[in-house]
Amino acid sequence: MSIRTEKVASLLQQELGAILEKELPRSSALSTVVDVKVTADLGIARIYVSVIGTEEQRTAIMAWLHDETKYLRKLLSAKIRHHFRRIPEIEFFEDRIYERASRIEQLLREVRKAPEQHD
């Protein structure tokens, strides 16, 4: 990734995080913009969102993001239009890295306990 695309990705992550904090429907689930990948031509931004909550909450939030993509892009445009001639199209993807990390930690704890049980 070039320095330009990294800067764009960082700005998009920051601004979208702020937008989602205000715009996401209130629920007990925690949502975070984890990463943003921007194509070399700056035409598409892939937004990776982590949702910590029940499966139902994750599904609902991801569905809302997909349904409201145009609206969210419009809000983003209003915030960053002075930085760009053209605002990238945005695509949302769910990132379950925290869920996977939690599962790995759980497995490691079980492995550490296993030798103690055999003594």
From Swiss-Prot:
MF terms (GO), sorted A to Z: ribosomal small subunit binding
An example Gene Ontology biological process:
maturation of SSU-rRNA
**Localized where?**
Cytoplasm
UniProt keyword terms in alphabetical order: Cytoplasm, Ribosome biogenesis
Query: Cytoplasm: present as a keyword of the record?
Result: yes
Q: Which domain of life is it from?
A: Bacteria
What InterPro entries does the record tag this protein with? KH_dom-like_a/b (IPR015946), RbfA (IPR000238), RbfA_dom_sf (IPR023799)
Main subcellular localisation? cytoplasm
Similarity comment: family membership? Belongs to the RbfA family.
- Binding partners and assembly: Monomer. Binds 30S ribosomal subunits, but not 50S ribosomal subunits or 70S ribosomes.
Name under which the protein is recorded: Ribosome-binding factor A
Task: Tell me the name of the encoding gene.
Answer: rbfA
